[in-house]
Amino acid sequence: NKNQNTDKPNVIFIYADDLGYGDLECYGAKNVQTPNVNRLASEGIRFINAHATAATSTPSRYSMLTGEYAWRKPGTDVAAGNAGMIIRPEQYTMADMFKSSGYATGAFGKWHLGLGDKTAQQDWNAPLSASLGDLGFDYSYIMAATADRVPCVFIENGQVANYDPSAPIEVSYIKNFPGE
């Protein structure tokens, strides 16, 4: 955006599942080449003494975005695909912190922190009742949960991306498919 303050550095925070310390070339990996990540590491900040608050997806993401230990907050274990939004809009997030410092914020990729106000009550055929815009993100293009949990859709700014009303989405973790 040409109206943004360009005196501040860009911040790109990459959060990956199952990526070990020795899996990237910039940390000593020999069997895989990661030239783009190497460049980010050489031109930015490369952490050499960082620790995860949890070993799995949902709780580690929760802690990273809120600054709270997930193990102290009930309901922050690995989220089901139809989980309601675990981080509540009134909670202060990393996105809120960046926005208050004048940054534009965005989230991209795997979310896995729930969407909508309540578990199993999302209407995937309409704008979601609670999404990343409520947590300080100006823009989002995310996968709702994981590739092995329905709905396997991308969500852009609180709505299913490329939604086709002639093919409505129904998600149930209780009802079987016809014929099952």
Predicted regions and their residues:
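Formylglycine-dependent sulfatase
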Residues: N1-E180
